[in-house]
Amino acid sequence: MTISNTRPITPDLIASHGLKPDEYERILNLIGREPTFTELGIFSAMWNEHCSYKSSKKWLRTLPTKGPRVIQGPGENAGVVDIDDGDCVVFKMESHNHPSYIEPYQGAATGVGGILRDVFTMGARPVAAMNALRFGSPDHPKTRHLVSGVVAGVGGYGNSFGVPTVGGEVEFDARYNGNILVNAFAAGLAKTDAIFYSKAEGVGLPVVYLGAKTGRDGVGGATMASAEFDESIEEKRPTVQVGDPFTEKCLLEACLELMQTGAVIAIQDMGAAGLTCSAVEMGAKGDLGIELDLDKVPVREERMTAYEMMLSESQERMLMVLRPEKEEEAKAIFVKWGLDFAIVGKTTDDLRFRILHQGEEVANLPIKELGDEAPEYDRPWTPARAPSPLATNDVPQADVSDALLKLVGSANNSSRRWVYEQYDTLIQGNSLQLPGGDAGVIRVEGHETKALAFSSDVTPRYVEADPFEGGKQAVAECWRNLTATGALPLAATDNLNFGNPERPEIMSQLVHAIKGIGEACQALDFPIVSGNVSLYNETNGQAILPTPTIGGVGLVRDWSKMARIRFAAANETILLAGAPESWGTHIGQSVYMRDIHGRTDGPAPHVDLGHERKVGDFVRGLIEDGLVTAVHDCSSGGLALAVAEMAIASGIGATIDAPAEHDPIPVFYGEDQGRYVVTVAEGSAETVAARAKAAGVALPVIGRTGGNAVQLGDARPVSVDELRSAHEAWFPNYMGGDLAPDN
């Protein structure tokens, strides 16, 4: 259906574009007339939450974004961090939540495609991907279908494009029943003197369209991603984009080849709001106007309107400002790769965004007010309310070994092998640590010893209980996971997934989580260099668990000394770095309370950032000096799960003592922060103990490796085979449909 640009602008039409009455008034005051239909669509796309961050911008500004290694912080397609020797890592994490719920395969696939494009737009070749996935309860009728589609979509795109998936998360909770989360991360490598930016410079220069043709897929996608779901969800299926990883691979190679010619002045990928957003961002950043002639845009469907072309989110497309003398050379590269190359406009000096179609001017708007001067809100938020502590004697009991078996085989703590074996984890030939450990690690090509570590973390149940502590914990756990491989954590990207910010209690979650993230990043020298905010993750008024995912990158100076989680040998000493006197104390919000006793009460664990840093720096020093043989951070499931995972990974058992006079439940299942399980060979034990004493780090000996079972204190031993069977069984059984879902 062709929609006229002179369609009457009614209150219903304004509301259907996600614009509030006061925002429409602002448009009228800004342009001094009623907008055309195309202009209304452009404002809707640029002023929605997905593109403008209007509810979160005030708080995002408070995050630490600078550091000695930060070359580019937030505001570009991705963050850029120096990794020495003239190399840099370019990375970002972004959500594709709403599309993935409506159309799981394409939603997840184009989420991967979009984040890869953000990275190579900056001039970097993608070298690693991660995906943090959150689904509804296993017994919800849609969950299995969504898991299957999303995992296939992530694998289908990443594998075909040729980037290894090195890590991620998969979690289930009934609060995601109506809104799943698909947070995609990508990282690439570039030279520090060859980074490309999106800021247009120079007047009268050609604006070039690159890549695939424009269709009607994804029209209105960014607006959909800024609204809650309701009963009309199926009608939103046409707003999901369709991806082609092979075209994207060609686009990558063509862009990197073009960048070597010196032809590129500015480049921006077409993501949310397509041609509109990319053109506005390039012009607004450079204080330039942009004029586009839509008759020149390569299309794959007939009779497309200006509105559809401006708002299409067809994939695998770029916009570029080009040096005119390089036009023929640039065109030849794209023709060689079988891609479209079309000059569709020019830069101007009047700060206007002008759109021509079939000889008519269909839009003429002020570019700055569309872009970096979009509306910004200081939404009301309620004060923080931390839950009361559990009573001292409120420690529900269970058999320690039964609990261990149940937790290692539970929906949220079982092996994710079923997921990551559908991803190519080895392509490019640089993978050193695959999913299943604390962090994924890849070698930096062309360098003998250097590697990069990647981790993605958040504990939503902590954030719901206490957004400030939960925000701190997400950063601390990511930093800890990188450290556990021996990496120096460099910087992070944040993907903030929350409900409707117009509700003060939800806005409060967002505000306090950002405050916690900021405090932790500051204390740990772990700046935020890129990110994404996804709000309105609600269905019929039911919000998701607040989920501020943190993706982090660390530098391993010598990968031959890198630590892994698996026990290296029998008869080694097991130590607990950073342990409190009783080894573990905090069971509020623990998986033990949730999965064994069905309780979600109590406070989140406190994160002492000074302690976190001291213990982490100490452990990293041990790894770099070759003094430890295995390392695993203590997080979900506490000491018990950490030891069990180390045993499962190695096939070697462990005997863990228990401190006298202490209840074994918090000792083994407490989720106190800032702890690492480490093993040392006989010859290193005294050296390590002396270093711990000098550093002021608690490092009690808690047991020994060996045998074929895990024994926790006085509890009955559980064989490693039994633990592995339980750990590996849940996911394939569930996806095969022959498992009680809550097992």
From Swiss-Prot:
Source organism, top-level taxon: Bacteria
Positions contributing to substrate binding: S95, H96, N97, H98, R117, Q241, E313, S314, Q315, S534
Residues at which Mg(2+) 1 binds: E94, N532
Pathway annotation: Purine metabolism; IMP biosynthesis via de novo pathway; 5-amino-1-(5-phospho-D-ribosyl)imidazole from N(2)-formyl-N(1)-(5-phospho-D-ribosyl)glycinamide: step 1/2
GO biological process: 'de novo' IMP biosynthetic process
Subunit (UniProt): Monomer. Part of the FGAM synthase complex composed of 1 PurL, 1 PurQ and 2 PurS subunits.
Family: Belongs to the FGAMS family.
Name of protein: Phosphoribosylformylglycinamidine synthase subunit PurL
Provenance organism: Rhizobium meliloti (strain 1021)
Gene this protein is translated from: purL
